[in-house]
Amino acid sequence: MHYVLLCSHSAEVCPRSNQKTRDMVLKLFPEMPSIAERTGVDIVAGPYVNQEHTMVAVVESDRAESLDRFLVEARFGQWNTVRILPSLPAEEGMK
């Protein structure tokens, strides 16, 4: 199953303006591929960031529990509100 992750945060905790968050993000982002592999998640695209205080990623996992473990270990919830959209490829979703 594919999941679109929409992670939004306030300007106050944005890594561009908050040193504590920046330090955490700079430490964790290089570890993201190994966290994903360890938790059974495949990062399909992203994470992408933008000026709207939103981070977007597309991941794939056979188990929702694996995705939850990935999000906890990657600490996305410590500085974001995470919205998870279970998604299908368009061809499959149109059936």
PLM region spans:
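Short S/T/G/P-rich N-terminal loop/turn motif that feeds into the first structured element of a domain
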Residues: M1-H53, D62-S66, S87-K95
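Glycine-centered loop/turn motif at secondary-structure junctions
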Residues: G40, R75-Q78
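Conserved RNP beta-strands of RNA recognition motif
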Residues: A57-V59
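Short amphipathic alpha-helices in soluble, non-transmembrane regions
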Residues: S66-R75
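Conserved short beta-strand edge segments in small beta-sheet-based binding/regulatory domains
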Residues: G77-P89
